[in-house]
Amino acid sequence: MKIALVQTNPVIGDFARNSATVLRWTAEAVKAGCRLAVFPELTLCGYPPQDLLERSDFINAHDRHLSTLTGKITDIGIIIGAIEKRSGSGKPLYNSAFLIDGGGIKARARKQLLPTYDVFDETRYFEPGSESTVACLDGERFGLTVCEDIWFEGRGYRIDPVRNILDTETVSLDFLVNISASPYHHGKINERNAVFSSLCRKNRLPLLYVNQVGGQDSLIFDGRSMVFDPRGVMVASAPGFRENMLIVDSKKWPAAPGLDLPEDSTATVLEALTLGVRDYLHKTGFKTAVIGLSGGIDSAVTAAVACRALGPENVLTVSLPSPYTSRASIDDARELAANLKCGFETISITGAMDAYRETLSPLFQGLAEDVTEQNIQARIRGNLLMALSNKFGHLLLSTGNKSEMAVGYCTLYGDMSGGLAVLSDVPKQMVYALARWLNTKEEIIPERVITRPPTAELKSDQLDQDDLPPYEVLDPILQAYLEEHASIDAICGRGFERKTVEDIVRRIWVNEYKRRQAATGLKVTTKAFGQGRRYPIVQNFQG
C-alpha cells in the first residue's frame, strides 16, 4: 500500500484554511497513487490550541469542519488528528486520531499519554484514552497512536500504549502509525531518533511518524516525518522546517536501505529561528520588521535571520548612535545592512538624551550618574523603534540573547521592547556559532563584529565582562542551572567558583519580573523562558 506522510503547517483556529490544506494534499496523494494519507496531531485546529479548547464555539466550529471534511474524503483514506467530544465525568474532550475512508470515520484512537511538563499542559483540557487502537485498511493492520503514546520509555508513565496493542492482538500488525505535534529544540532530533529506533527494535514493528511543521508563538515544529523499519533503522525521511509529502510503500520499506540520520547542528538552529520568525509575522498579519542595529553580534544575527525569513526588502534596520557609540559600531552596522541588502537608517539619540537630562536635572541635582542614565539611552532607542513600528506597520524584533535575559543584563522598556524576541533562548556562545555559520560562504556579518569584545556602549569604555563573567563561564553555569536543574553545590562541583555561581543564581531570581514582561521568544533549547518555565516572581529561594 502506498502511503503519503503529510507534514502540514496549520494556523490555529483557522479551520477553513486547515481543511483546505488537508484537501489539497489529499488530492496530491491521490494523484501519486496513494491509498492512505497521514496528517499530524490536531491537524484541523492546529497545535497547541490552549484555552481555545475551553470555548464551546471553537469546538462547535471544529466539529462542523470535521463533518464537512469527512464527507469529502471519498477517493482515499486519511488519518487526521482532531478533537473528539466526550460525555460523563472527567474532561470533556479527547485528543484523537481518526481514520476516515469512503466519507465516514472508520476508526479512532484516543491519546492515552497526555504530556504535562515543560510547554505541554494537555491534562488541563483532555481526558486520556483508555484503550489502544488497531485499524485496518485494504487488509493491512496498523496500530494507531498519537504523539506521546510512543514516548513511554524514560517518562515515568504507568502504561505503555504500544505494548498494550501488541499484548491484546492475536493477529500480527503490519506497522505502527504515530501522528504528532512535536516541537523542536536543539538536541530533539537525536532524542527522537533514539526513542523511535529503540521502539521499533523492541517491538519488531515498522513506525510511520508524521509531525506538524511551522511556528506557533514560541514553539517551532520541525516536521521531519520519518519511517523506521523493524530493525530500528530509518529508511525514509521528509525534510525539516517546511510542508512536505513523503510517499512510502508498505511492501517495499522492509528491503529499503538505511538512511543517514539527520544532524542537529548550528544550521538546524538557524533553520528553526528562520521559520519561527517567518511564521510569527505572517500568521499575525505582519509583512515587515524593524530592528535596532547596535553594531554588535546579537542585533547582527537577528537582522540576518529576519532577512532570511522575510526577504531583505521587508527588513528595516536602524542605527541609533549616542556619544558613547564608537565609530566602529556605526561602520559595522552600515556594512552589515549593505551585506544583507536590507533597509538602513540612522537616528542620533544625542538630542533626546540632552532633553531627558535637562528635564530630570532639578530632581537629579547633586546625584552622580549611574545605571539610570544608561537605561534612559536604551529606553530612548526602544521608544524610537516603536514609533517606526507604529507609523509604518513593522514588527519590532528585540535582539537580546538568553545569557543576558537570564541575568537581567537588559533594560525593561528599552532593548527589551518588541513583538518577538528572536534570540531570547539562544545562549551567547550559540549566537557566535550562528554568526560563524552565516559567514561560511561569504562574509555577511563583518568579522570585527564577531571578534571584538561585546559591549553595550552605554558609558565610556564599557565592556560586558565589566559586569558579567566571560560567556564561556556564564553559559555553562546557566545551562546547568536552568536546563539541567543542577544545584549550586553541584555546579560548583564542576569546577566553577562558588562566588560566581551564587552571583549568577541570584541574578536569575531577582530578574524574573523582567522576563515576565519580555516579548514572546522563540524556543530552541530544552528549557526556555516562557510558558514551559513557571517560577514565582515573589519568592525567597536562592538554591
Task: Locate the predicted segments by residue.
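ATP/NTP-dependent adenylation/nucleotidyl-transfer catalytic domains that generate, transfer
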Residues: 2, 204, 230, 256-295, ...
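Enzyme catalytic cores with a strong preference for nitrogen-chemistry domains
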Residues: 1-292, 303-312, 344
